[in-house]
Regions:
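Structural motif
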Residues: 4-11
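Cap/lid segment of the alpha/beta-hydrolase catalytic domain
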Residues: 25-146, 150-151, 178, 185
C-alpha cells in the first residue's frame, strides 16, 4: 500500500522467482484518480520545524480549496500510508495538509514533550502556521480553508474555530473533545477506581487537583468559547463512544443552539470512536453529510 493505493496483495514464489497479484484492497477505486501525499516541512512561529503530509487534488478547480486535518491522539503521528478520509476530500477537489504538530510522536523527544499542556496553545499555533504556509505557497486560498479532524483532531478543529476564527470558512469536528475540565475529571475518576494514574496524561493534559491544571483546563476548553465561532460547523459523534463520550458533542450542540450558531450534526446510534472505519452504513452516511457540508460551506 501507499498514500495513493489502499493495498495490493501478492504471492511471491522465491524458488520460481515469480510474483502473482492475488487481489486488491478496495478494487472499485480507480488508482489513477487517487493522489499521492507529499512529505513537506514548514517552520512554526517559534522556530520549530513541523513535518506534514500534503495531498493535492487532481481535479481542476476554480479555487484552491483546502482542508487542514490534524490527527488524533495527540500522541501519535501522521503515518505515510493510505488515508481514506484524506483521499475522500482530495477526490472532491480539495487540497489536504496533515501536520505533525508538536506533541506528535516519531519526531524526537524535544518535539514530543513540547506539546505538554499545550492543547489549544502552541500545538494549535503549529496547525495555524501550516494553514498560513499553505496560503503563502499557493496551496490554499485564504477564504477557502476548512479544518477537520477526529478525536484530538476534533478538539483541534474546535480550538481552531474558537481561538482563530478568522482562519476558517468551516469546520468538521468528529468525535472530538470539547470540555477539557470534564475530560480531566473523567480520567481522574477512572484512575482513582483503579488505584493508579498514568503520569503521561498528567504531563500532557494537566492535573485537575492543582490550581495550574484547573486554570489550563478552563483556558483550553472550546465549550467555554462558543461565542467566538463564526464559521459553520459539522459535528459527528458515535453515541456509544467510550473514549470521547457523547456528552462532548451534546453539550457543544446545546451551546451552539443557545448562541445561534450555524451547525449541522449527525449521531450514529450504534457506533463508537470512529469516523471512516465504522460500519459500512455509518461510514457512508458520515461521508455523505461531509460532502454536502463542504459543497455548501467551503465551495459556495
Amino acid at each position: 500500500s501507499n498514500t495513493d493505493n489502499p493495498g495490493d496483495y501478492y504471492l511471491v514464489n522465491l524458488n520460481q522467482g515469480t510474483v502473482k497479484l492475488l487481489f486488491q484492497r478496495s478494487p472499485w477505486l480507480d488508482r489513477d484518480k487517487l493522489a499521492k501525499a507529499i512529505p513537506v516541512k514548514y517552520m512554526s512561529r517559534d522556530g520549530m520545524e513541523i513535518p506534514a503530509l500534503l495531498t493535492l487534488t487532481k481535479k481542476k478547480t476554480d479555487k484552491n480549496y483546502f482542508i487542514v486535518m490534524p490527527h488524533g491522539g495527540p500522541n501519535t503521528k501522521q503515518y505515510i500510508g493510505y488515508d481514506s478520509w484524506a483521499q475522500f476530500f482530495v477526490s472532491r477537489g480539495v487540497n489536504v495538509l496533515q501536520p505533525d504538530f508538536r506533541g506528535s510522536t516519531g519526531n524526537g523527544t524535544a518535539h514530543y514533550v513540547a506539546g505538554n499542556m499545550q492543547w489549544g496553545k502552541t500545538m494549535q499555533a503549529d496547525i495555524s502556521d501550516g494553514v498560513l504556509w499553505a496560503i503563502e505557497n499557493g496551496y490554499a486560498d485564504e477564504d477557502r480553508v476548512c479544518i477537520a479532524g477526529a478525536s484530538y483532531g476534533g478538539y483541534a478543529t474546535m480550538a481552531g474555530l474558537v481561538f482563530t476564527p478568522e482562519l476558517y470558512r468551516c469546520g468538521i469536528n468528529a468525535i472530538g473533545v470539547t470540555d477539557m475540565q470534564q475530560l480531566l475529571n473523567d480520567y481522574s475518576k477512572k484512575a482513582s477506581i483503579l488505584s493508579s494514574w498514568d503520569k503521561e496524561p498528567l504531563l500532557e493534559w494537566g492535573d485537575m487537583s492543582t490550581e495550574k491544571g484547573r486554570a489550563y483546563a478552563e483556558e483550553t476548553s472550546p465549550l467555554l468559547y462558543v461565542d467566538n465561532i463564526v464559521a459553520p460547523l459539522l459535528v459527528l459523534q458515535g453515541s456509544n463512544d467510550p473514549i470521547v463520550e457523547a456528552y462532548h458533542a451534546e453539550d457543544l450542540i446545546s451551546e451552539l443552539k443557545a448562541k445561534g450558531k450555524t451547525y449541522e450534526a449527525m449521531f450514529q446510534q450504534y457506533e463508537e470512536h470512529c469516523v471512516t472505519y465504522c460500519g459500512e452504513k455509518a461510514t457512508l452516511e458520515y461521508l455523505e453529510i461531509q460532502e454536502d457540508f463542504i459543497n455548501k460551506y467551503l465551495k459556495n
